[in-house]
């Protein structure tokens, strides 16, 4: 065994860098896709609630959060008094 061959790299750095970049891009795309889903869910949930109860969009508080691999969508809606009274 040649001593110089022992310390040489078997792979060039370009393929390794390409693999790392592909992993980074895939991760970024996955994160951005999830936030788009949360925005769509927010709009659809508000549309369904507005279909059944008259709500003021200015009295709606929406929080989008992310903790590790979990995304959260928190919606606080101030309901009008008439909607809270049972008929």
Curated annotation (Swiss-Prot):
Keywords recorded for this protein, A-Z: Cell cycle, Cell division
SUPFAM superfamilies: Cell division protein MinE topological specificity domain (SSF55229)
Pfam families registered for this protein in UniProt: MinE
GO BP term (any one): cell division
This protein's record includes keyword DNA-binding: no
Keyword Methyltransferase set for record: no
Transmembrane segments: none
Name the record gives this protein: Cell division topological specificity factor
Natural source organism: Acidiphilium cryptum (strain JF-5)
Taxon lineage: Bacteria, Pseudomonadati, Pseudomonadota, Alphaproteobacteria, Acetobacterales
């Amino acid at each position: 065994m040649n001593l110089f061959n022992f310390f040489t790299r078997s792979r060039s750095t370009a393929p390794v860098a390409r693999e790392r970049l592909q992993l980074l891009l895939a991760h970024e795309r996955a994160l951005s896709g999830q936030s788009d889903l949360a925005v769509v869910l927010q709009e659809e949930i508000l549309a369904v609630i507005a279909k059944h109860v008259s709500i003021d969009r200015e009295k709606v508080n929406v929080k989008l959060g992310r903790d590790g691999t979990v995304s959260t969508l928190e919606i606080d809606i101030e309901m009008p008094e008439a909607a809270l009274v049972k008929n």
